[in-house]
Amino acid sequence: DVLGSRGLGDVYKRQIIGWGQYWNIIESNHPLFSITGTFTNPGPYGAFLGIALLIQIHFAWHKYIAKQYMSLFMLLIVGLLTGSMFIASFSRAAWVALLIAVSFFFFLFQKKRYRYAGLLLLILFLFSSPFLYQLKKQSADGRLFIWRVCTELIQSKPYTGGGASSFAARYMYAQADFLEKHPNHEYAAKATNNIYAFNEYLRIACEYGLPGILLYVTIWLHGIYCKATYCDRLRKLLLIYLAVFSLFSYTFQVLPLAVLCIVLGAFQNNNSKFTFYAFPMRYLVIMLLLMTIIAWSGTRSSQYEKKEILFTAKQLYTQQNYADAKEYLEKAAYLSPTSEILMDLGNSYFHLQNNAKAEHCFRIACNMVPGRILPQYYLFRFYAITMRNQEAITLGQSILFGDY
């Protein structure tokens, strides 16, 4: 309860920011989304609001059992405000996670009428799934396409994976390879640059292989699947919520959510039958928090390094210092490739008279995002300048009559 109370306090602060963005008092952190809270997009914000609602439901139930109706009334008022912002966040992943977590909330009771309520909620989820899909169909199709490409990454290195934090470095090349093999894929014209798997389980499998995903799932099950005498109800519900949310988002790439997962996994009742906690729990929690923060800091440092490399590359490229720009663009293309980076790298190679590598970069950029004209134009211009007229004509006709 103490953990829940402190968590609610933090979420309430974020909720106030959300209402400020809703009324255009506070500026959003994303040009395409009006409500993002303290985050850069609505996904993590919706996750935190869902956590708040789940905690409120837990507290409200206990107030109802204890017949503390005044406290229950206050919780319902606060829950109404939180629920309104939760819906406004438009985070479908958080909606699904909350619905399933609340269903399990009722399944935890012994009385059949409560379990029937949980079953009804699960049935509601099944019937509402098509509506949630159609609500933002293009976004849903995009995630399905990303997951399809992720399976290609997993198949390429099923046992070892690509290594820690390798997803961003490998994904766009895998997407380019997939769309080159399947040029008529229904999502080819809509494909964009991307660095997220939108599924923590797939990301872990891509980076650490089958052993990594087995360990990851085992850790989740260890935290969730335990008897009521060994773990408290709220902790289990929050873990279920985060486990479901991780199916559609990037939970462990948002520091507050990653820390919350670690803390919830570490907290066990003193009567736990597991005996590997040989020293005080607070020390274990501190160690886990430090490990999470260090790992996240390393990721942030890597992201900062990528931005610095890309910024330097862009400056040198704009100044037409192609020899030096090439060095930085090669690093950027290795760490976090995009079609823009490959186009600039291709142009740098071209100006340095390395036509083979220039064509290779332009082709990859075209395959990464087949629905964009600019990569096609650069390849067309390359063919025209190098006097490869037939290829230039063929590509030019494709650009003129293509569906862009």
Regions found by a protein language model. Give the residues of each.
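Hydrophobic alpha-helical transmembrane segments in integral membrane proteins
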Residues: 129-145, 286-319
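Interfacial juxtamembrane loops and adjacent helix segments
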Residues: 22-34, 164-206
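Short coil turns that delineate tetratricopeptide repeat
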Residues: 336-337, 370, 404
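Alpha-solenoid helical repeat scaffolds
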Residues: 310-311, 340-344, 373-381
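Alpha-helical transmembrane segments of multi-pass inner-membrane proteins
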Residues: 5, 10-33, 37-112, 116-133, ...
